[in-house]
């Protein structure tokens, strides 16, 4: 495939680009390529700005987006309790979608049932000072234990049924086997003692009651932790108000439910109110707090024509907006859908934990049976049953099964709240072993917006303010990025341009008009030379070397000023590059700008490898070359013109997406334009991996130690675990994993 890059034959190519200590790359730059630059074609650009590399500084076009519904998110979707959504196959039997309030109620009612059972029955035949007996107390224990087994054991019995139905027996099956063996044997002992009062067959009612109560408590705590793991997303779902103020056609207000709002409706949002939907400001100006939805900590200034995001908080101004995205297709819904999909995917570590958890059931089953047979010969039937039940209860595939999904739920939620959106969850795992970060210059390292970088007055009869008034008169009605940059500069300087009359385009070279009764032109270098105007080539070269686009102001056929416009480097870019280097990741800059402009930016930022004059296909080829060298590459770009290279890289990251987060080619989407968010993603990926490894070690290590102990391997030295203690340890193992996930920040 010809990508326009030929590292073998540089001498026959035009526009040698880049600076690479190891090797150089060249690009075939035809006339067509010179018209297709880093940010695509600019259809309506006035012709006087076609000089030099002007097309290379194109304005990014982040289209508009629509997004999603947060008003109808129920508990199971948000909390991650349904493990099938978390890619947790082994826990499929556990009905985590049960409302936590119902589970809490089941625990408390089971505890009430368990208290008299504990008071009226001995533990393993041992009597305690608090034990109470009376005629018929054994019947009370039987009835209460039966109710407790059916009611309190229901989640575990139902879970086991589902696991077996799916041919994936795991923790719920083990627990169900344990409590069923304890209950059935206890009923047998009750009948045997009833038939022959002179013999005493020990029951397990005490153990059964404590087992069920402790496991219900453990799973309630765990469910709460799982819910908290996605707490950030739960808060996102609660950001939208229930009612809004809608403007009627006659201008009066009406209060309506958010569900009644449609695209095109006009709403009024007062100071301090939450933005009910995505929209565009029609009237007013304000400062909006978007921290809860995009992670942008600073207030964002908004005025007429700007977009607002549903769920953000209006600041000190009252505004009127036109709805562009309702709860069903707004930004928040799109974020939630993206996060749900990411949480549903599986990483390599999760596949590993699922396999181990699946085999753990069979290990526990075999060890439990072996323990039963061994203790039947070494002791008696009650002791043998106790060992087997304890093994079944203490084995916890759940801890292993939850090890990864809980961390994933937490990390994806944290990422989403901070404007780091994962479209491919494996990107989080791959981000820990990166070798190279490739950065598209415009929009990533620079602001992506033109501004006036220099004005050189060539005629002492004119002052800078007057020069700007002339330029503003010509550019006031133009709509290309350079004109926008000039007019924004005038606005910042609070300069009102002159009025232009008889304005006309000079085909391919610039603009001309009558301003203040003088003939005024703004033209490019080609036209200036044609008119015989004297231009200092060294001065022009200096401007261009800094990545500037240069135009010339001519008043009454006399060259009076040179104006340079450039894309300003972001203040935080230099610190970002230094931080990347400290992580032993090589920064590489890619740009459609000319090599001299690329060199100026790269040298200022401390980037040793850079390539200029590139088209999208060229960038993809460069990414592929690094991949062919065995490097793991993250490509950061705008997600639109960089789509091929984003898709080709190990990780594709779109930066500065704003609300337009539906970027198919990216694995990660950053809503803000701050390159430091890339560092935040890398740090979160590192911490996420650390938590995953910790949880895997805990889940595996716990079972390696706990199962032999439950089988009675240390009985010779007097260390024997009862089923109740086994239940406590099993519950604690899942709680530890859950709480460890919650410490991820």
Swiss-Prot record:
Q: Name the Gene Ontology biological process terms.
A: copper ion homeostasis
Residues on the Extracellular side?
Answer: 129-139, 192-200, 380-388, 722-723
Q: Where are the catalytic residues?
A: 440 (4-aspartylphosphate intermediate)
Q: Where does the record say this protein resides?
A: Cell membrane
Keyword annotations for this protein? ATP-binding, Cell membrane, Copper, Copper transport, Ion transport, Magnesium, Membrane, Metal-binding, Nucleotide-binding, Phosphoprotein, Repeat, Translocase, Transmembrane, Transmembrane helix, Transport
What spans are recorded as compositionally biased (Basic and acidic residues)?
36-76
- Chief site of localization: membrane
Region annotated Disordered, chain positions: 1-76
Q: What spans does the record annotate as topological domain Cytoplasmic, numbered to this chain?
A: 1-108, 161-170, 218-359, 410-703, 745
What PROSITE patterns does the record point to?
Answer: ATPASE_E1_E2
Please report what switches on or represses expression of this protein.
Answer: By copper and silver.
A Gene Ontology molecular function term of the record: P-type monovalent copper transporter activity
Name any one Pfam family assigned in the record.
Answer: E1-E2_ATPase
Region named 3 X 12 AA approximate repeats: 60-97
This protein's assembly is summarised as: Monomer.
Q: What does the function comment of this entry state?
A: Involved in copper export. Can also export silver.
The identity of this protein, by name, is Copper-exporting P-type ATPase B
Source organism (scientific name) = Enterococcus hirae (strain ATCC 9790 / DSM 20160 / JCM 8729 / LMG 6399 / NBRC 3181 / NCIMB 6459 / NCDO 1258 / NCTC 12367 / WDCM 00089 / R)
């Amino acid at each position: 495939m010809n990508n326009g890059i030929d590292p073998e034959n540089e001498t026959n190519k035009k526009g040698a680009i880049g600076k690479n200590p190891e090797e150089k790359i060249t690009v075939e730059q035809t006339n067509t390529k010179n018209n297709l630059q880093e940010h695509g074609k600019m259809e309506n650009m006035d012709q006087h700005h076609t000089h030099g590399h002007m097309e290379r500084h194109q304005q990014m076009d982040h289209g508009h987006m629509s997004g999603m519904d947060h008003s109808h998110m129920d508990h199971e979707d948000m909390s991650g309790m349904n493990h099938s959504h978390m890619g947790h196959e082994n826990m499929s039997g556990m009905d985590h979608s049960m409302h936590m309030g119902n589970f809490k109620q089941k625990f408390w009612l089971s505890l009430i049932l368990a208290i008299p059972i504990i008071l009226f029955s001995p533990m393993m035949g041992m009597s305690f000072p608090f034990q109470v007996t009376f005629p018929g107390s054994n019947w009370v224990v039987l009835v209460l234990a039966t109710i407790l087994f059916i009611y309190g054991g229901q989640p575990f019995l139902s879970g086991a049924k589902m696991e077996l139905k799916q041919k994936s027996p795991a923790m719920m099956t083990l627990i169900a086997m344990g409590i069923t063996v304890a209950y059935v044997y206890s009923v047998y002992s009750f009948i045997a003692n009833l038939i022959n009062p002179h013999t005493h067959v020990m029951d397990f009612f005490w153990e059964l009651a404590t087992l069920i109560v402790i496991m219900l408590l453990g799973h309630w705590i765990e469910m709460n932790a799982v819910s908290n793991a996605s707490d950030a997303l739960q808060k996102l779902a609660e950001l939208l108000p229930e009612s809004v103020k809608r403007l009627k056609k006659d201008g009066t207000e009406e209060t309506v439910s958010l569900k009644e709002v449609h695209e095109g409706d006009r709403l009024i949002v007062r100071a301090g109110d939450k933005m009910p939907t995505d929209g565009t400001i029609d009237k007013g100006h304000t400062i909006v707090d978007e921290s809860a939805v995009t992670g942008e900590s600073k207030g964002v200034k908004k005025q007429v024509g700007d977009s607002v995001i549903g769920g953000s908080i209006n600041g000190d101004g009252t505004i009127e907006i036109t709805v562009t995205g309702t709860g069903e297709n707004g930004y928040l819904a799109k974020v939630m859908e993206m996060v749900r999909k990411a949480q549903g995917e599986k990483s390599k570590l999760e596949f590993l934990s699922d396999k181990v958890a699946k085999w753990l059931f069979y290990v526990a089953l075999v060890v439990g049976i072996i323990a039963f047979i061994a203790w039947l010969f070494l002791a008696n039937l009650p002791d043998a049953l106790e060992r087997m039940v304890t093994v079944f209860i203490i084995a916890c595939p759940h801890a292993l099964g939850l090890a990864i999904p809980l961390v994933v739920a937490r990390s994806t939620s944290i990422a989403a709240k901070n404007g780091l959106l994962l479209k491919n969850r494996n990107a989080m795992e791959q981000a820990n072993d990166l070798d190279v970060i490739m950065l598209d210059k415009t929009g990533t390292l620079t602001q992506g917006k033109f501004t006036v970088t220099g004005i050189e007055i060539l005629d002492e009869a004119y002052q800078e303010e007057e020069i700007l008034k002339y330029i503003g008169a010509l550019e006031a009605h133009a709509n290309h990025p350079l004109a926008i940059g000039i007019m924004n500069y005038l606005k910042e300087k609070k300069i009102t341009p002159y009025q232009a009359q008889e304005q006309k385009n000079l085909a391919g070279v610039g603009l001309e008009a009558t301003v203040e009764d003088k003939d005024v032109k703004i033209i490019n270098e080609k036209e200036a030379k044609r008119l015989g105007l004297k231009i200092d080539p060294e001065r022009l070269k200096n401007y261009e070397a800094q990545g500037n686009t240069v135009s010339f102001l001519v008043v009454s056929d006399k060259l009076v000023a040179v104006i340079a416009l450039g894309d300003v480097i972001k203040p935080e870019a230099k610190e970002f590059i230094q931080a990347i280097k400290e992580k032993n990741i090589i920064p590489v800059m890619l740009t459609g700008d000319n090599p001299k402009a690329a060199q100026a930016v790269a040298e200022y930022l401390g980037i040793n490898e850079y390539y200029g004059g590139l088209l999208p296909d060229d960038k993809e080829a460069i990414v592929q070359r690094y991949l062919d060298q065995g490097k793991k590459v993250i490509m950061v770009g705008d997600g639109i013109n960089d789509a091929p290279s984003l898709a080709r890289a190990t990780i594709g990251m779109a930066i500065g997406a704003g609300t337009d987060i539906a970027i198919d080619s990216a694995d990660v989407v950053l809503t803000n334009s701050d390159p430091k968010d890339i560092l935040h993603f890398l740090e979160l990926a590192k911490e996420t991996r650390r938590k995953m490894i910790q949880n895997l070690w805990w889940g595996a290590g716990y079972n390696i130690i706990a199962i032999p102990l439950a089988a009675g391997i240390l009985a010779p030295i007097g260390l024997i675990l009862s089923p109740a203690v086994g239940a406590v340890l099993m519950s604690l193992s899942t709680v530890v994993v859950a709480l460890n996930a919650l410490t991820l920040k």
